[in-house]
Amino acid sequence: MSAGEAFAGGVAVVTGAGSGLGAGLARHASGLGMTVVLADIDGAAAARVAEELRAAGGSAVDVVCDVRDPDAVQDLAERVYRDVGAVRLLVNNAGVEQFGYLWDTPVANWQRTIDINVSGVFYGVRAFLPKMMATDERAWVWNVASVGAVVAIPLQAPYIVSKHAVLALTECLYLEVESTGHANHIHVQVVLPGPVSSSIFESAGGIDANGDVVAAEAQRSAMLDLKATAMDPTDAAGALFQQAIDGRFYLHTHPDAVGAAMAERADVLASQRSPALRTQSRFDTTKR
């Protein structure tokens, strides 16, 4: 079965759809013939992408939604099922970054990262999945983690913690769906993207002036350097949709680099050795 055959005519809900990977996923879903609900805290950004999709002949609805608010996410689910239709694809994508040493991280920034990156995924699952399971129709739940879900990186601890949590949440959810007899029609998958063009690093939280701002901004700069070779979001989306149809649990944008990171993580755990600082980016292919 092709992605077009699986998804055409269905409804996709994408959080964080106003930019980056979320916008790419929305564009690709629309290209497959899906009605796309674009949810974002930045209503203007979601509206721009939705208008682009409509101008190209697609069906799109933009909604302002703060995934930190469980009531807002529940209301989104109720509105979608009432006004648009049953959801075939739920993408819990909204996320933020955070730079700086953990001891320099403002409590508010820690909470923001966890609230959006982890609780936002939970709220999405809690609001939509019971409705998706209530029918026998095939449906997909994608929770967007990161290659950061299988690595340890200094100066990005809140983000890395949050993505490890999303991976664990999705693994548990997969087993719960299976144990309740819904795995024949509900497909739970985790997305582990590598560098994809977005503004996540520019909008990342920083630290207070009395912390090591130089170190925090150096890490931001290092991550921004990845943008030079980052994947186009729409290209990334195409790869993810195909992998989803192939039945994979782990969906990758950079299979070689992410696969190597997963193998490295497995080796660290199996050998029970301490984490090791890296001297180069895992996405630098020039030195392999």
Label each PLM-derived region with a short phrase.
Residues S179-H254:
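SDR active-site lid
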Residues V125, S162:
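Active-site helix of classical SDR
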Residues G43-A44, V64-D75, V107:
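The beta1-alpha1 cofactor-binding region of Rossmann-like NAD(H)/NADP(H)-dependent oxidoreductases
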Residues S2-V37:
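Canonical Rossmann dinucleotide-binding motif of NAD(H)/NADP(H)-dependent dehydrogenases/reductases
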Residues S146:
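Residue(s) in the substrate-gating loop at a strand-loop-helix junction
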Residues Y101-L102, N109-Q111:
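Substrate-binding pocket helix/loop in short-chain dehydrogenase/reductase
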Residues L32-R48:
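Conserved glycine-rich Rossmann-like NAD(P)H-binding loop of the short-chain dehydrogenase/reductase
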